[in-house]
């Protein structure tokens, strides 16, 4: 089993913390360590999210004002030099360095920093121009699928089959944190018709659920598991509550070495009723997932000029516009 330790912004923009996180992920048994190429300069100003929208007591758009989000992201950025040093350091401890690309304009920059393995967030699974460019430029893609409609996923798989040197599809649920009864882990087997390797990106609440969702995913055939990773107290970072430690990684890897029958027996003994996580292989996105998709899909784009942040001045990841 491959384990991707997702550092996200749990490093708080501090490269010394990044290196310590890499060390602990390696000690836990991770195979991959991932950062995110999130840059405030790529954040689009969209008026509908400044105050959010409620109609007849129903949320139509979440509230996420641009300026506070810009300021927050700006303080979490790693420099280009630090990203290149991240690649070198992860490789020096024998693991695979990864990053998530959030804007088409960053593809070449990421390649120049030495990355060869890329994660595509589920909100960009249907950003077909960027997906194609990433597939052509890098050696391997891990593509999350949680916020993607089935017709979009089928087309994404066609793009990957045609252009990618290698790829995996990851099931996830874009609800943070994800309740166990909303996991729909049967989706993992369903994804195997579109990829030779499938996996799971887990967003469950660690303090409540531990590693049960990830273990159940492995018992359902996940060959890759991705989880947010931290060395800090969960209260210190935005993603802390859904982030695990090296001890959690070890427990999952030990579990993955059991036979499938023993895995299910352990789940039944330690987590009676775990089958509630299986859910449906084919399903519609929940209202919460649709609201998150509405905000996060199109959150980042490539500015047409320095300092631009309005929609008309940005190239979206799903636009065929040449950069």
What are these regions (language model features)?
Residues 1-323:
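Catalytic cores and adjacent flexible loops of soluble metabolic enzymes
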């Amino acid at each position: 089993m491959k384990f991707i330790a997702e550092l996200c912004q749990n490093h708080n923009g501090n490269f010394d913390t990044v290196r310590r996180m890499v060390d602990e992920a390696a000690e836990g048994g991770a195979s991959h360590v991932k950062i995110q190429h999130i840059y405030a300069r790529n954040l689009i100003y969209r008026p509908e999210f400044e105050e959010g929208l409620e109609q007849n007591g129903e949320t139509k758009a979440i509230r996420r004002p641009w300026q506070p989000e810009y300021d927050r992201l700006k303080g979490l950025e790693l420099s280009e030099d630090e990203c290149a040093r991240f690649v070198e350091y992860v490789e020096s401890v024998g693991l695979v360095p990864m990053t998530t690309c959030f804007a088409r304009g960053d593809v070449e920059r990421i390649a120049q920093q030495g990355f060869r393995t890329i994660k595509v967030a589920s909100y960009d699974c249907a950003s077909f121009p960027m997906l194609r460019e990433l597939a052509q430029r890098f050696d391997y893609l891990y593509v999350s699928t949680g916020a993607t409609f089935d017709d979009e996923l089928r087309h994404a798989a066609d793009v990957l089959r045609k252009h990618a040197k290698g790829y995996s599809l990851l099931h996830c649920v874009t609800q943070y944190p994800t309740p166990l009864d909303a996991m729909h882990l049967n989706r993992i087997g369903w994804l195997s018709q579109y990829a030779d390797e499938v996996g799971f990106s887990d967003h469950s609440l660690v303090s409540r659920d531990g590693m049960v969702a990830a273990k159940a995913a492995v018992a359902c055939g996940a060959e890759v598991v991705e989880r947010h990773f931290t060395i800090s107290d969960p209260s210190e970072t935005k993603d802390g509550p859904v982030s695990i430690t090296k001890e959690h990684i070890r427990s999952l890897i030990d579990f993955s070495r059991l036979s499938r029958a023993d895995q299910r027996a352990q789940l039944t003994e330690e987590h009676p009723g775990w089958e509630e996580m299986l859910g449906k292989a084919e399903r519609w996105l929940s209202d919460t997932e649709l609201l998150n998709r509405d905000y996060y899909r199109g959150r980042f784009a490539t500015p047409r000029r320095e300092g631009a942040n309005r929609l008309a001045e940005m190239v979206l990841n799903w636009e065929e516009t040449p950069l």
